[in-house]
Amino acid sequence: MGKRLLDKLWERHVVVTNENGLDLLYIDLHLVHEVTSPQAFEGLRLANRTVRRPELTFATMDHNIPTKDVWNITDRIAKQQLDTLRDNCKQFKVRLADIGDEEQGIVHVIGPELGLTQPGKTIVCGDSHTATHGAFGALAFGIGTSEVEHVLATQTLWQRKPKAMGIELKGKLPKGVYAKDIILHLLSKYGVAVGTGHVMEFYGETIRDMGMEERMTLCNMAIEGGAKAGIIAPDEKTFSYVKGREYAPKDYETFTGKWSELYTDSDAIYDLHISVDVTDLAPYVTWGTNPSMGVPIDEKLPEKHNENDERAFSYMGLSPGQSTFEIPVKHVFIGSCTNSRLSDLEIAASVVKGKKVKEGVRALVVPGSKSVRERAMQKGLHRIFEEAGFEWREPGCSMCLGMNPDQVPEGEHCASTSNRNFEGRQGKGARTHLVSPAMAAAAALYGHFVDIRKESYDGTISYS
């Protein structure tokens, strides 16, 4: 019987298997940020240990930093965490993308753009959305603080091998429909626990047509379906993306030969399999308090089926049977590790070019990294957004989570390109609606959701 991509990635990294069936995995890349690392570094200090492979460890500041004035950190805990990371990286000789550095940005944005993320690697980070890197054919997953310490100390991690779930995506995406809509559709149809105990492998015609940045969006949100990780077999698009980046292999041809072996064999069998045709897929909007509570833009909000639905409708201030077009959008956030890359900003800019944000709507564009921001500005995207009435910010996690100054006021609705819509995620009482960058941009213009498929834009942009 053939092997799945998961099998090949896993087997390449097993150091030893213990009597309980746990495998000790070697970790190729450890990404670190300011929130989940302080206790881990302190554990090393108390045990008189060092970081075993500092050259395989890379840190950045992203969760806590302000995006309007990055140096004006008024929150005491946030400042302490940032200062602590800076001190820890200096003491333990770990590379740090500090505030103001050209490499700084959201951890799951800078990993790929610096060439740190590569096919065949095992990648961990103290962050749920580490699965993003799986778009490159890497086995990437989030870990807890105690595990962060273990990896820092040993460059290994004890893990039980998950099952393999195949998700075949067939057909061509319609105009105005993106990877974000695919994953929201999957979550709406199959729920937040469908991938529990599995690694999701996305494959098929739709995947082959996708660029790397949309593939990252898919893998980023695999965790929202309960999966350990999301992965996609690397191809020529992957190799081309990695080639020439700062930390990419210099002997490129040697590595691409090895990377080309990373695919699921034709006779391999998944433990669980789903097939979805995206040909008639519509843009999605979430209405509730987890990412599976979503509907196509042209459908009404569903009936209440259980207590969770009852609570969600109450928290969101919405009702069954209500149209998505009736939801009042007061805030728009285009950013996060899900949708803050250059192609995301290009799509949003193509929607708003020459138009104006609706009066009373606060709209933020937060690039995922310094590099994304600079490249966007070279193309004039910042002018398009600012002329439309958006705020053009510095890179950071921003409004994705209520850990920095960018928050949504209680009781107000936000169209967000982030990945989670839990209660209080964007601030106390904030009401979050997950959408694609195109849908978020359009909502900023109207003050409510619209069907982007009916808007007069072609998904491309002229920089003249």
Curated annotation (Swiss-Prot):
CDD domains listed in its UniProt record: IPMI
The Gene Ontology terms for molecular function here are: 3-isopropylmalate dehydratase activity; 4 iron, 4 sulfur cluster binding; metal ion binding
Which keywords accompany this UniProt record? 4Fe-4S, Amino-acid biosynthesis, Branched-chain amino acid biosynthesis, Iron, Iron-sulfur, Leucine biosynthesis, Lyase, Metal-binding
Q: Which family does it belong to?
A: Belongs to the aconitase/IPM isomerase family. LeuC type 1 subfamily.
- What HAMAP family is this protein classified in? LeuC_type1
Describe the subunit structure: Heterodimer of LeuC and LeuD.
Could you tell me what this protein is called? 3-isopropylmalate dehydratase large subunit
The record lists the lineage as: Bacteria, Bacillati, Bacillota, Bacilli, Bacillales
What is the primary gene name for this protein? leuC
